[in-house]
Amino acid sequence: MKAKRRFNIWLWVLLCVPCLLASCDHNVHDGEEESGLSVSLTWADEADQGTEVKDVKLWIFNADDGSLVEEKHYGSAQEVASQRFALPEGHYQILAITNLIEPFFTTDQTRALTNWNNIQIGLTNPKDVKHNAYFGVTDVRIDNKEGNYVVQNPVKSVLAELTIIIENVPKGTEMSGKALDAAWCLFPTQKNSDGEYGLPSIKPTEVEMPTILATESTLQSEVIRLMPTIQGSPASHVYLRLLLPNGTLQEYDITAPAMKVGGKYELRLNYNQMQPKMNLEATINGWTNLNNEVEIK
């Protein structure tokens, strides 16, 4: 989805800039015979622009009683944008999830989702996830005084992303490990402690990290995608194993700030300064919240 900053009376296009969850534009399709509600997906995080959208699932719920009004499945964001929903007057909440393909799943995929508060996004296998899924929640009030409504729904990544970099390691060192307290699932329609949609479960799961071989003096993992830290925990915990070329096994227990929904993080360490137990704070070198380095325009 590419950024566009305006649309005309005949063609409205996707906006790829952050916007308010409750934003709603009127009269976008004035002059057209068909009226109703249309949904425009946008990127909440500018860093996600350019991500291919392969699959979109959309649910519209009655915000007053939580009942399901519409459930749709699309192949692209453009298909979503072209759909119009003829809805009676009322208050509605909209959930969109993109790229919800293996290993991602939602609650009870064999039947329709009928309860707004119980929707879950999970992973059939949390190890070595190659792509992210994205979700967005917004609401709209329909009063039928205007014939056409366009609601913009910003989507953000479900999983946190972590990159581990260790400098000055002996060449041939192998790194493996696991994240100990990633959430088992995410409730996309419930708000977290920051007041944002996306509440991690209380139930944890361990996420095994792929084994990486240091071919040079710097060992760098690929992006590790995992569920955010469990609900209520102020910290995340990472267990690392380094197998040196001489067969020595070294183990490290690392405590770092909690990983949030859609967060992007970098753990950078110097092998010569590593200790069996390390407590990293957000204010010191070693743990970097990459979200703070992404310019939001």
Task: Name each region found by the language model.
Residues E52-Q109, E174-V261, N292-K297:
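Tryptophan-paired
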Residues K2-W12:
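Bacterial N-terminal signal peptides that target proteins for export
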Residues Q152-L159, L226-G232:
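Conserved "repeat-terminator" motif of extracellular CCP/Sushi domains
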Residues K4, D25-E34, Q273-K297:
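Intrinsically disordered, low-complexity repeat and linker tracts
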Residues H26-Q49, I166-G172:
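Short amphipathic, basic-aromatic surface patches that mediate peripheral association
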Residues A81-Q83, Y149-N153:
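Short strand-edge motifs at loop-to-beta-strand transitions and within beta-strands
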Residues L20-S23:
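C-terminal motif of bacterial Sec signal peptides marking the signal peptidase cleavage site
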